Amino acid sequence: MDENQTAALFADLESSNKPTIRAAVDKLVKLTADAPTLADELSRLLDDSRGKHRWPAAYILAHLPHPSQRVFNVLINALDHPDADIRWAVMLLLVRLAKTDGEIVRLLFELRETGTPTQRRMALYCIRDLNLTDTASLQALLDSLRDDDPTVRVAAVTSLKGRLGIDSGGRKMLYDIFVNDPDLRVRNAAAVTLAQLGAPSGEFLAALKLAEASEHAQLRKAATAALSIIQKRRSAPAGG
């Protein structure tokens, strides 16, 4: 590929059209693997004061062996990007890289506490998708149930759905959220998550029955869904 074609790809990184950006990123990922000069140019773009080039450059460089800390820092910052598609693309990349790089896992745990609400939420989704089974990651999810931002609490609640080892204390936290959280979105999510954990307590079942008669349509819907999940689990064949 000649210099004009390469320059055109770099120009496409500034496009307002996401498919155009994505096509340029994909082509540059392939080209940069065999062209150190392109990697150097992309590294310079990490310091782009306007910010438009930064996340695409970091995304491309992250596909090379041994990405720098600067690359990871830009990607972490991109988890706060206003465009959800970009956030999720970066999230998927970070999850893939974190499976073989413990430093990224550490950065995600740190971001869960120190980031913006959007970053904290995306960090939780990353932790969820890593399918971690250790007590530290479980505690991180439980700690985020107390986050000030309701969207972060929703992310924490939904990320607990597939986790094993949630003890009575964790279940009590979810129950309290279902009954008392000031945001209905969080309560709705807690109802379904608790139901999916199995072995519902009597007080949870009673609270679901009350919620079925709520004046809030979404809460009624969540309670009905939770009760349906519980019923299906009870009627499922043993060991099935």
Report the location of each language-model feature.
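Amphipathic alpha-helical scaffolding segments comprising HEAT/armadillo-like alpha-solenoid repeats
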Residues: 1-12, 33-47, 66-80, 99-112, ...
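Long hydrophobic alpha-helical segments typical of transmembrane helices together
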Residues: 207, 213-223
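Short inter-helical turns and helix N-cap capping residues of alpha-solenoid HEAT/ARM repeat scaffolds
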Residues: 16-18, 49-50, 82-83, 115-116, ...
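Structural detector for internal amphipathic alpha-helices that build alpha-solenoid repeat scaffolds
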Residues: 1, 19-34, 52-67, 77, ...
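Positively charged, hydrophobic/aromatic-enriched amphipathic segments
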Residues: 11, 17-24, 43-44
